[in-house]
């Protein structure tokens, strides 16, 4: 056999070996991905803030932020669209609104870092669109859609809820017309908002302020309008600092009552 023929045969075997290794690697990567795919679970509800979380076994570790301050950097928020989390259409009529203020809520449920925001949003919408009995026995009517306009996940990801063109819903005694409703996942009576959540809240609030000409003194919480503990003490006590940072960033010249 000539030297050229031997060289060609060696190259052929080398190519076959390389493709075999590549295929083997891809196969094991795919198998690994499939084995790590989470199982779908049922949804449940029973919370004062009218938020449903997906029922699943999760790591008990709470990713709580220990910072007492927001960082001083700003960027436009990245918002997961309704289409991206596969939202259903609203099931009824909703009240059109002109956005005048920002109102902050918490879900009043334990943070669930192992569940994707897409699944949480689908669960929230399922719960919102049916009548239910809430914690304490209070009845909730079926709403047309998710009650909040924006949902901030434990990792800081933001999802679009109800279209901000329409007023949100509440199970407490106040009129949410004109409010851009932002909810952060967690029970902030016992947990702390994560650093990522606080950064996303700040960026989202600034973006809304610019878009709708909202002043910093129009950024308040659920408990400022209704008899409720929402958004929990561990978030509520951070709001004065949030307003100041946003006011400074917007270049407001009045103190706005702070």
What are the language-model segments listed below?
Residues 96-139:
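Active-site acidic/histidine clusters and adjacent loop/turn architecture
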Residues 2-103, 107, 111, 142, ...:
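Basic/polar, cationic surfaces and motifs that engage anionic cell-wall
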Residues 131, 139-146, 154:
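Glycine-/small-residue-enriched capping loops at alpha/beta junctions
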């Amino acid at each position: 056999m000539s030297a050229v023929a031997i060289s060609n045969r060696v190259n052929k075997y080398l190519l076959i070996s390389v493709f075999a290794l590549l295929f083997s690697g891809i196969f094991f990567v795919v198998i690994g991905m499939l084995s790590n795919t989470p199982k779908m679970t049922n949804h449940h509800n029973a919370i004062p803030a009218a938020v449903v979380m997906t029922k699943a076994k999760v790591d008990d570790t709470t990713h709580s932020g220990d910072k007492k301050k927001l960082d001083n950097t700003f960027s436009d928020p990245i918002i997961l669209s309704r289409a991206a989390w596969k939202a259903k259409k609203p099931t009824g009529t909703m009240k059109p609104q002109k956005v005048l203020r920002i109102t902050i809520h918490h879900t009043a449920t334990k943070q669930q870092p192992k569940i994707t925001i897409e699944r949480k949003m689908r669960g929230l919408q399922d719960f919102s669109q049916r009548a239910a009995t809430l914690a304490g026995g209070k009845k909730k009517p079926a709403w047309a859609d998710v009650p909040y306009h924006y949902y901030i996940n434990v990792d800081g990801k933001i999802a679009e809820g109800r279209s901000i063109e329409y007023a949100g819903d509440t199970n407490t005694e106040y009129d949410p017309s004109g409010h851009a409703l932002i909810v952060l996942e967690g029970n902030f009576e016992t947990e702390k908002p994560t650093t990522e959540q606080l950064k996303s809240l700040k960026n989202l609030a600034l973006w809304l302020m610019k878009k709708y000409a909202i002043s910093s003194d129009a950024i308040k919480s659920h408990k400022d309008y209704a008899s409720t503990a929402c958004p929990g003490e561990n978030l509520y006590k951070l709001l004065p600092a949030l307003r100041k940072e946003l006011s400074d960033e917007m270049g407001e010249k009045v103190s706005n009552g702070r």
